[in-house]
Design a protein with these regions (language model features):
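A membrane-topology feature that recognizes alpha-helical transmembrane segments
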Residues: 1-82, 87-181
Length: 181
């Protein structure tokens, strides 16, 4: 199983690099990794269990990992907080790692993003302005319509999540490093 975890970190590493350089995570990478994970887990299940049932168990666990790991990112995408490539990358990581390890990598990725984003904003000198606008967005629904503070879309900050996803996948691999391959 460790080989699948390493593959997930490698896919996340390539995605982080392309996301940092271009702002996009390519479909060939995410969907290719997702498809390869399904096929590889099917054949790995057959090899380990010496039966078709083992293959379908591996395939099912891989598909479940993709779905489970895409749920929270899909909600964030629906709310306009992340891009579609991030969802597909989380799904590919879930398919490669299965649900539990995929969710572990996802949790580490969101923790990394929660640490990196404020540091990045502070480096650019935008931290306190962004925090003020964020507070206004949180408080606005509780204000009267005439007292609401509008935030123009051009002042909203966008954060590339790919590097944080790589950090999450790498930490997950390190946490499982001593396990059986």
């Amino acid at each position: 199983m460790l080989y699948f975890l390493i593959a997930a970190a490698a896919v996340a590493g390539v995605a982080a690099w392309t996301d940092a350089k271009t702002g996009h995570i390519p479909n060939w990478l995410t969907l290719g990794a997702l498809g390869a994970a399904l096929v590889a887990h099917f054949f790995a299940g057959i090899a380990f269990a010496h039966s078709w049932r083992g293959g379908f168990t591996g395939l099912g666990a891989s598909a479940a990992g993709a779905v489970v790991c895409a749920l929270v990112p899909a909600f964030f995408y629906w709310r306009g907080a992340i891009g579609g490539g991030d969802i597909k990358l989380f799904a590919a990581i879930g398919a490669l790692c299965h649900p539990m390890d995929g969710l572990e990598a996802e949790t580490y990725a969101f923790i990394a993003a929660a640490l990196i984003a404020p540091a990045q904003l502070a480096y650019k000198g935008l931290l306190f302005q962004t925090l003020g606008r964020s507070l206004a967005l949180v408080v606005n629904p509780f204000r009267k319509a005439e007292n609401r503070k509008e935030t123009p879309p051009e002042l909203m900050t966008w954060f590339r999540l790919g590097p944080s996803i790589f950090v999450g996948a790498a930490v997950m691999v390190l946490m499982h490093w001593g396990e059986q391959p």
